[in-house]
């Protein structure tokens, strides 16, 4: 029997192999896995639904298919997830999501990042920040924008392996630690 991490890696390799190599398809699968992972972690009812041996396999597959339809996920990805249902390994979904993002970085040269600003930026400013981050990291980046008024100004950009924090809040905290305030 494969260890859990090995099984998750194999599932991700299969998904990457089967997904069409178009940016749109790749990102749809990423969004789908993200939604599934978040729901699985936060919703006990959903988690119990997928892990319960008393619930019919077909009911689980139908639930998965209806969610996948909303995200227009290729059927090949569903085949991999159906296999996880068959071996009762849906608990691996959060790990599969994490590993899928790493594969996106390696194979596709794409990076997913989170940009946190004090207020919603203009389109022009967002493009400028994105271009600058693309140039710094030398990668194509898919950015998710979030607001956090506590930052006061500046921004925070996060990926799995990189954090760029230019926020006023952090600068003030650093000053306070040093004793400057």
From Swiss-Prot:
Q: How does it assemble?
A: F-type ATPases have 2 components, F(1) - the catalytic core - and F(0) - the membrane proton channel. F(1) has five subunits: alpha(3), beta(3), gamma(1), delta(1), epsilon(1). F(0) has three main subunits: a(1), b(2) and c(10-14). The alpha and beta chains form an alternating ring which encloses part of the gamma chain. F(1) is attached to F(0) by a central stalk formed by the gamma and epsilon chains, while a peripheral stalk is formed by the delta and b chains.
Tell me where it mainly resides.
membrane
User: Which purpose does this protein serve, as stated in its record?
Assistant: F(1)F(0) ATP synthase produces ATP from ADP in the presence of a proton or sodium gradient. F-type ATPases consist of two structural domains, F(1) containing the extramembraneous catalytic core and F(0) containing the membrane proton channel, linked together by a central stalk and a peripheral stalk. During catalysis, ATP synthesis in the catalytic domain of F(1) is coupled via a rotary mechanism of the central stalk subunits to proton translocation. This protein is part of the stalk that links CF(0) to CF(1). It either transmits conformational changes from CF(0) to CF(1) or is implicated in proton conduction.
Question: Where does this protein come from, organism-wise?
Answer: Aquifex aeolicus (strain VF5)
Name of the encoding gene: atpH
Q: Name one GO biological process term.
A: proton motive force-driven ATP synthesis
Gene Ontology CC terms = plasma membrane; proton-transporting ATP synthase complex
Q: Which SUPFAM superfamilies match?
A: N-terminal domain of the delta subunit of the F1F0-ATP synthase
What membrane topology does the UniProt entry give?
Answer: Peripheral membrane protein
**Family designation:** Belongs to the ATPase delta chain family.
Membrane is among the record's keywords: yes
Q: Where in the cell is it found?
A: Cell inner membrane
Molecular function as annotated in GO: proton-transporting ATP synthase activity, rotational mechanism
InterPro entries in alphabetical order: ATP_synth_OSCP/delta_N_sf, ATPase_OSCP/dsu
What UniProt keywords are attached to this protein's entry? ATP synthesis, Cell inner membrane, Cell membrane, CF(1), Hydrogen ion transport, Ion transport, Membrane, Transport
Pfam families tied to this protein: OSCP (PF00213)
Q: Is Ribosomal protein there in the keyword field?
A: no
- Name listed for the protein in its UniProt record: ATP synthase subunit delta
């Amino acid at each position: 029997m494969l260890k859990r991490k090995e099984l998750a890696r194999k599932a991700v390799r299969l998904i990457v192999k089967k997904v069409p190599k178009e940016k749109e398809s790749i990102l749809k699968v990423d969004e789908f896995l993200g939604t599934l992972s978040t729901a699985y972690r936060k919703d006990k009812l959903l988690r119990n639904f997928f892990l319960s041996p008393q619930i019919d396999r077909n009911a689980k597959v139908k639930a998965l298919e209806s969610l996948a339809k909303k995200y227009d996920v290729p059927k090949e990805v569903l085949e991999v997830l159906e296999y996880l249902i068959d071996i009762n390994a849906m608990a691996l979904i959060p790990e599969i999501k994490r590993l899928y993002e790493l594969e996106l970085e390696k194979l596709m040269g794409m990076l997913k990042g989170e940009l946190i600003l004090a207020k919603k930026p203009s389109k022009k400013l967002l493009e400028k920040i994105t271009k600058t981050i693309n140039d710094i990291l030398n990668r194509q980046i898919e950015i998710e924008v979030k607001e956090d008024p506590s930052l006061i100004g500046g921004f925070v950009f996060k990926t799995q392996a990189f954090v760029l924090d230019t926020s006023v809040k952090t600068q003030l905290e650093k000053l306070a630690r040093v004793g400057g305030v």
